[in-house]
Curated annotation (Swiss-Prot):
Similarity annotation: Belongs to the FPG family.
Zn finger spans (FPG-type): 229-263
Cofactor(s) required, per the database record: Zn(2+)
GO MF annotations in UniProt: class I DNA-(apurinic or apyrimidinic site) endonuclease activity; damaged DNA binding; oxidized pyrimidine nucleobase lesion DNA N-glycosylase activity; zinc ion binding
Gene: nei
Protein name in the entry: Endonuclease 8
């Protein structure tokens, strides 16, 4: 599943295609969304926001399209009039004079009013987004030490969108390697230096992934600045200590680590 940097990059591409342009045609696959087709035609997309792995497409009439790609959903940008070659099932089409964005295969799609945005179950449950520039390491540290999260092992905590939105497995692996910790640790057991290092890494690594490339290719490195240090590198030498990177399973997900320098 794509993680926060990939979702934000996808949103950037969608915004670049249609933001600020009048919608010339709107189509939804689901019956409950059909009434909104006429309401949105002629409106403009004002911005596309990410909340972790969910996308919020905001329209000029105050409505917001909520979509969560889950495992199979994917957005695409095409030239208007182009017929894409795909076997995927189309769910949403937002068309302007020159560009069209398409959502395929997703099933978690809703139209929300401004009031409904504040009460939506997923949006209420999800934590602060790691790519939100307003989120600081100090706030992350306070969240780590809060009664809700301080007793949680990092193996599960760093996958929990209620803790920090946008984290996922490759980010979990790389963050813990960066700070030299294993997934069995809990925030309550860390010293001040470890807490500070982890609080910064929880923001720095996702943001570096987003700004340098932001696309998940699990068999290749991430751009020139951010590259995988341990993810999918089992059997290779750790660049920090020379130990051999190992692969195991934590919280039902593949986990890569260096037993020599992650303690």
């Amino acid at each position: 599943m794509p993680e926060g940097p990939e979702i934000r990059r996808a949103a950037d591409n969608l915004e670049a295609a249609i933001k600020g342009k009048p919608l010339t045609d709107v189509w939804f696959a689901f019956a409950q969304l059909k009434p909104y087709e006429s309401q949105l035609t002629g409106q403009i997309v004002t911005r596309i926001e990410t909340r972790g792995k969910a996308l919020l497409t905001h329209f000029s009439n105050g409505l917001t399209l909520y979509s969560h790609n889950q495992l199979y959903g994917v957005w695409r940008v095409i030239d208007t009039g182009e017929i894409p070659k795909t076997t995927r099932i189309l769910r949403v089409r937002l068309q302007t004079a020159d560009k069209t964005i398409l959502l395929y295969s997703a099933s978690d799609i809703e139209m929300l009013t401004a009031e409904q945005l504040t009460t939506h179950p997923f949006l209420q449950r999800v934590g602060p987004d790691v790519l939100d520039a307003r989120l600081t390491p100090e706030e992350v540290k306070a969240r780590l030490l809060s009664p809700r999260f301080r007793n949680r092992q990092f193996s599960g905590l760093l996958l929990d969108q209620a803790f920090l939105a946008g984290l996922g497995n490759y980010l979990r692996v790389e963050i813990l390697w960066q700070v030299g910790l294993t997934g069995q640790h809990k925030a309550k057991d860390l010293n001040e230096a470890q807490l500070n290092a982890l609080s910064h890494a929880l923001l720095d690594i996702p943001r570096l992934s987003y700004t340098t490339r932001g696309q998940a290719d699990e068999n290749k490195h991430h751009g020139a600045l951010f590259r995988f240090k341990v993810f999918h590198r089992d059997g290779e030498a750790c660049e920090r200590c020379g130990g051999i990177i190992e692969k195991t399973t934590l919280s039902s997900r593949p986990f890569y680590w260096c037993p020599h320098c992650q303690k």
